[in-house]
Amino acid sequence: MDILALFQDAMEKLPQRVVIHKRTPFKNDEIEGITNALKQAGISEIDLITITQEYDLKFIAEKIMYGQFLEDGYPVDRGTCIKLSSRNALLWTHGVVPSIQSNRRYYQGGRCIPAPLKITKYYGPGDLETIAKEILGFTKMNWNSFNLYTKLPATIDTSNT
């Protein structure tokens, strides 16, 4: 039984939208094969996304004090997203989050400057903001861990193991 049949059996209908994440670039024949198969099954909303780690890019937060930009001493906030083009964005899935103490911030791991994920959209109607929010949500789906989040979304992280 293929994945579409399993989904239809469980949900009694096919999904309206399919998003595929992978770590390597999509080749033209992959795009054609995936989109043709899904369209034949009646699925028209298809997004094909690559997610890679950009280890060489590091940013720290800045704050404005006395009219000047100063280093904040902390990494950028988790969820920071910089759109590079209509197809590419940088997303920080690891970074500062609000603490339960109102005057503090929490940085999981407490050291090193986090590197962003590079999101590249190869195909589909989905906007990068929605895609980035979905990827960020998938970083909170590792139920085998007590961590607040993982650096990689579950769609990529589980394929690494």
Model-identified regions with their sequence ranges:
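Long, contiguous domain-sized segments
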Residues: 1-161
